[in-house]
Amino acid sequence: MAAISQKIGNLIGGVSQQPDTNKFNGQLRSCDNFYPDTALGLTKRPGLRGISKLANAVADGTWFPIFRDDQEKYIIQFSKAGALKIWSANSGLQQTVNAVAAESITYATHKSADELQTLQINDYIFVLNRTKTVEAGTAAAAAQTPFGFVTINTVAYSSNYTITLDNATSFSYATPVTTAPPQAQLNVNDIVGNLVSSINANANYYAAGIGNTIYISRINGANFALSAVGGNAGTSITAFKGSVTSAAQLPKSFFKDWKIKVEGTTDSGTDDYWVKFITSDNTSAGAGFWEETIAPGVIQDLNATTMPHVIIREANGTFTYRQLDLASATGSAGPSTVTGIVTAVAISSATSGGHVVGEQFAANGGTGNNLRLQVDRVTNSVSSVSSAANSSSYIRQDRTLIGYTTAGRTTSPAYRYTYVWIFNGQQIGVNSNGAPLTIGNTVYQQNGAYQTIGNELRAGITATTTINGVISAISIVQAGQGYTATNTVSNSAGDTFTITTVNAAPLEGDASRLNFWKYREIGDATTNPMPSFVGYPVDLISFYKNRIVFTSRQNVICSQAGDYFNFFASTVITIVDSDPVDISASTLKPIRLKHAISTPQGLLLFGDNAQMLLSTTTEAFSPKTAEVNLLSTLSQTDRIAPVDIGSSYIFVEEGVKASSIYEMAVTDINTKPQSTELTRPLPSYIPSAIVDMQVSQSAGTLAILSKQETRNLYLYRWFQLGDNRVSGWFRWIMPSDVEFFTFDHDILFVVTKHGSNYVLSRMSLLTDTPAESLLFEGQYLDVRLDLFDYNPTRVYNSGTDLTRICFKDGFEDTNLQPVLMFLNADVAGYFEEQTLQYDAAAAVGQKYFLTVDGNQTTSKFAIGYKYEASAQLPAFYFVKDDRGGKDTLNIPRVSRIKVNSYNSGPYRAVIRAEGRDDFVLELPQVNADNYLANNIPIIRNAQSTIPVMAKGNQFEFELIADSPFQTAFTSIDWEGTYNNKGIQSL
């Protein structure tokens, strides 16, 4: 049998449920709590950094992220009963929500999370309830008493001018018969005046003259009939009852605010419009002009209680949740005086390292809230401590006789020298040459000649500690409010800052407080109808081409361009490009378009059995050019919003027991989208009952949460280079049930439930914390703990001579293993797994704790919970060629496996072979012959050998990393024997 050696080039292929014989190199049977990375390999996922308990969060709530910018990030929750709560995502502090009207609470009442949707457009946060049927309002344009008017167009002598009302009563005036003297000049005012006087003499009618026009109505306001004849031509006198057939027939002088309909074609009312008279001098009657208006008595508004509501951030930092009606807008608060706005901050004490210019952080403490600071300059802090040979800190030279050497007739003893480093009475390292010793950011070096102290040979040492990245200048990026001068605030690393000056300022509230769902101001129910969503629920709220977009059933409705709150036309005389769009999608099956993604081709709309594209084939998007075209008829679960991963879109199709995840690429509106099932190699891996799916494009990571496994996030990561993609599926097991998660760029925010507490945490997917964390060979590495805290509260008890290292309020969880990590440079990397302790009498935030000996209130610690990462490899087969073909007939016998790692801490390898006990090999990641006390147990590049001695398909091989340190597996080499019995494969 031939000895062979083969390499598995990486382990980032993710989980595959295909038979091991069909798996590609790099694919795994299982992968939990690892994060595949093309640069680093299979890395242990970052830990969750605990932010805060979310005060007053409720069970079974519906959560949404509101990320306005880097400074203002919020997490909101609606209870099923409609109550709203808001917290800062940066600090976890609950924000003030002003009193909410009962109708707004009712609007947000819901039974399942998918019934609610939010949409953030700059300063607006819209809230949609998909179950609420939109209704027309009750505000109607003012009714108008039936009236008519008669216009005297020409005057003539010897003529009769007759007005007949209700086909029965006539009023006439006869002009003089001649123009010979002494007859006066004929004037239209005489005709108008005499006819008005004649009509007003009848108790049933009222008339008024203005210019050459006579206004007529019934005294009791009832309707009536009107006609007029006279003059010496057919058009000498004309009568109109409430409407005209041409704008040319409108009088040049009339009474202010009276309305007349201008009729279009006789067989349709769709081209009619209404006009209102405006006097030039704003008096009650006179010359003026006509402008387009709303018909009398027409309902103008939408019922705001049934329309989407809005969350508004007020000037004083509070939030208002309300309906968008006229009364609320006009009654909203105007400018308000905000006090305690921070204008200057000074550094009080900055000792932590690892900070970088541009780093931003929330300032904790003080009387106010929402203060954020930025690092503008950093410096390096260097401190040295020297000690003499006869002190408790020294280097000791030991020698051991190892033999003799002979030179000529001289024989001399040969010694091996070792150098033992002692600091404050504790051995911290051993080396063979006495060269300076580096532990963390401290360098220990000999500072004098060796001398005999007792029976030892010693020299003094100097310990030089260099802390890089100490904050030396800061600026304010978010001033906050409610602070007072002399307030002390801090960052999470324990650096402190003093607020030196504050001021007060009158600030306007958010502009959205002045907006409301606009009224219909033009036309009538036929010419300017209610939007097609009236009478039905709104299924989706989105944004496209500077318009708010609603969908309702198969209809797509867009607001006016630039006027997000207006769904009525600005004129009915012509079609204006900025007017609303209201079109219907043509489908064979009923459809509800519940999700949308903006694409270069248009607005991609998703229904449960079809995908549509709202677009235009011209440059301008308008009522005349807008189209909704069918792209595909792929089936999907419409409870879960599809996501945009940059070059394509991902959506979910749920089965009874498992879910399928599809990717769809849209190239143009004339080409059918290409669809690929991403879960084809693992058909039963993703559970059904999906509740949320989110994506981080910057980290190339998709995450899915299911009701069936509430502690687990299923993730898909991809790396795209041109047309080539490396991708894989894997699972993250969270410390407790996940209530909510979302991405903000490469930051994952997670809310987990621990007992009755809801805890907000964050995870940085691409970079480790640039301060506070462990320093390894000049690189900061975060601890691999969940709910970890780099600056826990420390309380010393002199009676027990113990220091309590406390978990934050709400972070206690007896189902998890607490870990205490020491961060001081001389002991960095030392950690203890302890039992969680409880003191009911302690202050809030100090009730749950771990302990260390002595008074260590000035020492640095990290505290958190242990989590385990594990990956199981498939069976080992001989790979015959570069294409990955496996010889599944002739199974090799594996002698040993060599695991290559990078920047990795301790881990263990487990071999489960048929017919023998499990073999577990602990790999501590400590270099031989180089002892550094309490040094971080991480090796930059390492290869560990695990003995196997089993056939490639008769054992399981699993890698487990449960230490609080980073672990990254780059590749696998295996050695063994292989015999193909002389048969050559074709």
Protein language model regions, located:
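Beta-sheet repeat architectures centered on beta-propellers
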Residues: 2-61, 65-73, 657-986
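Beta-strand initiation motifs
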Residues: 92-96, 285-288, 509-510, 577-578, ...
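Catalytic or ion-translocation cores adjacent to nucleophile or general acid/base/metal-coordination motifs
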Residues: 618-657
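Structural signature of eukaryotic scaffold interfaces centered on beta-propeller domains
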Residues: 56-71, 109-121, 530-545, 585-600, ...
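Loop/turn residues immediately N-terminal
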Residues: 80-85, 131-133, 213-214, 547, ...
